[in-house]
């Protein structure tokens, strides 16, 4: 029980994005990523509008529950922000206990429909230890209208590179499945050094360099993403609390998973050289944004409710029966 309370100075510094060619974030989690992220829809749209970013992708873990509110707020005349509707899914092949993160973005209304199908199928048929997983064959079946990204360190590509130590030609085969590849700030993967998977920060840079080489060899785009879970740098203490509550022993070592401005992101990838950094931070994410329509996750005209044979008569009979029991 709290015996006293006092207002604390949150210390939040209002950041601005003054870059004349702003970036697009393609990997971001809202509070709908259960017990994992802290960004609210209102906070996100307000920030994206203020920073002048052309669009933002929302990719919550295994769910699309943020979509209705995202559509409502982003399409308001006072905001008019483009949202790229997506999800971070759990991809698996034949091993029941092994799945990989994958970013799935809806390119158009067909993609929205197929994304919904994947959400339904993964929750109804392939839940394993709380994770709604998507078989690769099912994803391929419903791939129309979707853009697939290789995701984070928990994705198939980085896991195969860092933990399985697969040779380069095998990595090329894996990378060829995806429409674009993803690299992230070094802080996101700092635990790989802490746990001995790579020797030092230079090893983390080499992971990103290898992904870039793969994209060059395969003719694919590589994009730099934040994998944002909270809005500002100082917010990571709150995610530490969430992770501690979930039992993570390394919760105190929180990576800086905050949403970065364009210049902040360019600084993160300065080791690639100015031209290459601009390519992955600004040019390529904007190219992917240009491929994507302004989608409506909730239809404007009507909703398509399920048709269950005999349901109207059954409901009527149930109501009359209950009424007779009560009265």
Which residues does each predicted region cover?
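Domain-core and long-helix interface of multi-subunit machines
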Residues: 9-58, 62-78, 117, 121-235, ...
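Hydrophobic alpha-helical scaffolding
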Residues: 34, 105, 197-204, 252-259, ...
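Phosphate/diphosphate-binding loops
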Residues: 82-93, 98-101, 211-217, 230-235, ...
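Residues in well-ordered beta-strands of folded domains
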Residues: 84, 90, 103-106, 149-150, ...
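A short acidic, often aromatic-flanked loop/helix-cap motif at beta-alpha or helix-coil junctions
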Residues: 89-94, 112, 156-157, 188-190
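Metal-dependent DNA phosphodiester-chemistry modules and their immediately adjacent helices/loops
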Residues: 94-95, 105-132, 250-267
